[in-house]
């Protein structure tokens, strides 16, 4: 269908300049929307975490953590690559759902095929942001280490990374929840719903833990 082929015709979001990307978000098209922005927040968090690690490697007084910082830099860059792919994946998942809604529904057979296709595409549209949320939460543990043990001159950058990662988790989970609302597979819904609730709680707690610590450290 033409909507499905639009997925392949559309320019990759990640190849746009920052200005072009923001203009696209501000446009009247529903994608890129919150899901792609959640993935972008994850990519920003990863990039900042890598930066703080790289600013620590080879610095006097941080020799003890050199190996850990090299590891963190590698992990963060790997995560960044995954989040960058998810910026487009989220918009493509939306396009798939939209394409299914345009399927013919003249006969009972067509109606059944359309309904099944919508359900499957919606499941996928919930699973894409779910993975973003899981990855962003995993990244928060890495950020915690880099914030506590990394270069003190870059500690606020690590805090911004933590806030961006929390935004990625919570934003992605919003997109999970909106897709769960129209699914008939109650077992699938309940499983993702409880994982989403737990991830949200854990992400907020981890962010608060770090920010409380660092705000204490920065007090004058």
Where are these regions (language model features)?
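Transmembrane signal-anchor/signal-peptide helices with a preference for the extracytoplasmic
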Residues: 51-63
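Acidic-glycine-rich active-site phosphate/pyrophosphate-binding loop
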Residues: 10-25, 134-145
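Short, small-residue-biased leader/transition segments that mark boundaries at the very start
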Residues: 1-8
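Conserved phosphate/anionic-ligand binding catalytic regions in large, soluble enzymes, centered on
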Residues: 27-50, 153-172
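Amphipathic alpha-helical interface segments
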Residues: 90, 94-163, 167
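Preference for long, well-ordered alpha-helical segments
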Residues: 139-142, 154-214, 220
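Amphipathic alpha-helix face/heptad-repeat signature
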Residues: 40-44, 72, 79-86, 125-135, ...
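A structural-propensity feature for long, helix-poor, extended segments
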Residues: 60-100, 199, 206
């Amino acid at each position: 269908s033409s909507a499905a082929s639009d997925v392949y015709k559309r320019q990759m979001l990640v190849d746009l300049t920052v200005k072009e990307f923001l203009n696209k978000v501000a446009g009247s098209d529903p994608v890129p929307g919150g899901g792609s922005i959640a993935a972008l927040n994850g990519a920003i968090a990863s990039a900042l975490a890598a930066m703080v690690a790289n600013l620590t490697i080879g610095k006097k007084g941080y020799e003890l953590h050199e190996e850990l910082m090299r590891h963190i830099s590698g992990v963060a860059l790997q995560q960044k690559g995954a989040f960058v792919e998810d910026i487009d994946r989220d918009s493509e998942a939306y396009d798939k759902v939209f394409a299914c809604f345009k399927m013919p529904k003249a006969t009972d057979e067509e109606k059944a095929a359309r309904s099944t296709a919508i359900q499957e595409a919606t499941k996928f549209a919930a699973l894409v942001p779910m993975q973003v949320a899981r990855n962003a939460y995993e990244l928060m543990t890495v950020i915690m280490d880099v914030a506590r043990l990394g270069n003190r001159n870059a500690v606020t950058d690590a805090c911004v990374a933590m806030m961006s990662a929390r935004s990625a988790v919570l934003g992605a989970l919003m997109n999970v929840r909106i897709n769960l609302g129209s699914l008939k597979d109650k077992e699938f819904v309940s499983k993702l719903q409880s994982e989403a609730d737990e991830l949200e709680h854990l992400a907020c707690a981890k962010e608060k833990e770090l920010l409380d610590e660092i705000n204490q450290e920065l007090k004058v």
